[in-house]
Regions:
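Beta-propeller domain segments
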Residues: 2-14, 42, 85, 159-296
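Structural motif
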Residues: 48-52, 104-114, 165-166, 173, ...
Length: 296
């Protein structure tokens, strides 16, 4: 196989580790892209959109064009400040973004905004606005959006550095939920998660449906977790009670065995951590292959 590598610089701010990897400023420097038809769409962490012909990856210049949107004006009208994005998803000619927001009381939340997709102007409204009122900014937000069945989306919500809320079924930190795109109602699919950066939905060759996710542990204990929806159970993956990692200060308050304490064991865990990221599954005739990216 022959590969061609080219480097392109987008007209957005680049990651700056001098701020520290937990800094809000770097959250605004995380950018996301998606393809639709023969076009590639990119959104910056500050909410600016561009697009270009995907074939331009094979040339010397992307020749990107600005894609206007009402995003900043809409959030200002709703008394929110954009603190960063967590995903971009295009489905059924609609564009969805997950956003970290600060309200006028300087509390934080995560939400999903949607717009009919076109190349003239994106006009956003809230699809999902839980207004979680988290006291402090956190990078452990999850925020992955993927397509699901029956006119629904899957959405991961991280621990938000509020571990006392993760095991509470009435609160959203540490959950994976499904959201109906029409009536905006949501349903819990699992809890006890930490920071689910990878999320994927698939059916095997027998028609069974699965949700698989990858999530960051503390120091060690990165996990891949799988939920067989055939069982129709609300699975609990154990955070912050059970983990195969330890705290960064060296303390270890966690139960290392999940099952013995009533929690779901991970499909696989990694200690030391690998910096796990996105995940996907490919169906084969006899088995399914899981692909996960990482910083290792």
């Amino acid at each position: 196989l022959k590969y061609s590598f080219r480097e392109f610089f987008l007209p957005f701010k680049r990651l700056d580790l001098s701020y520290g990897w937990r800094a809000v400023e770097n959250s605004k420097r995380a950018h996301y892209l998606e393809t639709i038809g023969d076009k590639t769409i990119v959104v910056s962490g500050e909410g600016d959109f561009i697009y270009f012909d995907t074939n331009n990856f094979n040339s010397d210049k992307l020749l990107q064009k600005r894609l206007p949107s009402n995003l900043k004006q809409f959030l200002e009208k709703k008394n929110f400040t954009l603190m960063g994005l967590r995903d971009l998803h295009i489905d059924d000619n609609k564009l969805y973004i997950s956003v970290i927001l600060q309200n006028i009381n300087e509390k934080y939340t995560i939400g999903i905004l949607s717009s009919e997709f076109n190349f003239q102007e994106l006009k956003f409204n809230f699809l999902f606005d839980p207004n979680m009122d988290i006291a402090e900014y956190s990078i452990g937000t999850g925020g992955r959006i993927v397509g699901y069945d029956n006119n629904q989306l899957l959405f991961s919500i991280g621990h938000f550095s509020v571990p006392d809320k993760v095991q509470n079924k009435k609160l959203l930190p540490g959950k994976i939920i499904s959201i109906n795109k029409e009536n905006k109602n949501y349903e819990l699919l699992s809890l006890g998660h930490r920071n689910q950066q990878g999320l994927f939905y698939f059916q095997d060759n027998t028609g069974n449906q699965f949700v698989i996710n990858s999530e960051h542990g503390p120091k060690g204990g990165d996990e891949i977790n799988i939920n067989n929806l055939k069982d129709n159970k609300l699975l609990n993956f154990g955070w912050p009670v059970a983990s195969y990692g330890i705290n960064y200060d060296g303390s270890n308050p966690f139960k290392s065995t999940h099952k013995e304490h009533g929690y779901q064991e991970p499909l696989i865990y990694f200690t030391p951590s690998i910096g796990i990221s996105e995940i996907s599954v490919k169906n084969n005739d006899d088995y399914n292959t899981i692909y996960a990216s990482s910083l290792r």
